[in-house]
A protein has these predicted regions:
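Walker B catalytic acidic pair
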Residues: 106
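Active-site-proximal or metal-binding-adjacent scaffold patches in catalytic folds
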Residues: 1-101, 110-140
Length: 140
């Protein structure tokens, strides 16, 4: 019996993310199901996106918090250069695709923090937006 070809973890994670978005979020009726964000689900998608988009190079944030936010779907905060980022996601998100896109959005800010120590929507953020849209159909 021939052996299965080995697939790298990041390729498998990309496929997992694409398949999930296509199956559960695309044009299917399942996308209209009510979704409740939890920290466990946020951590799950953080790990999947880290493998798929960042090749597992993004260090873990110090925490991911789900709480009510005013005027934003998510935040990525770091108080000092030595701190890991804290990612906060709005508890009011009821759409799975928006939730995954928000986690990805805040992960790009986390990457910006570790790479350049800035959290903005300038050139590097726009490049990541193109990457996520092209590869996963997610608009950050």
């Amino acid at each position: 019996m021939p052996k299965k070809p080995k697939i790298s973890r990041s390729v498998a994670a990309k496929k997992k993310l694409k398949d999930h978005l296509k199956t559960h979020i695309g044009k299917s009726k399942k996308s209209s199901y009510y979704f409740t964000p939890t920290e466990a689900v946020a951590w799950y998608w953080w790990r999947v996106i880290n493998k798929a988009a960042f090749k597992n190079k993004l260090p873990y944030p110090s925490e991911i918090v789900i709480r009510k936010l005013r005027g934003a779907w998510g935040l990525c905060n770091a108080k000092s250069r030595a701190d890991n980022c804290v990612i906060t996601i709005s508890s009011e998100i009821t759409n799975r695709k928006l939730f995954i896109a928000t986690v990805a959005h805040e992960m790009v800010h986390q990457w910006q923090w570790y790479d350049k120590r800035s959290l903005d929507h300038a050139t590097s953020f726009r490049e990541w937006n193109v990457y996520f849209k092209r590869n996963f159909g997610i608009v950050l």
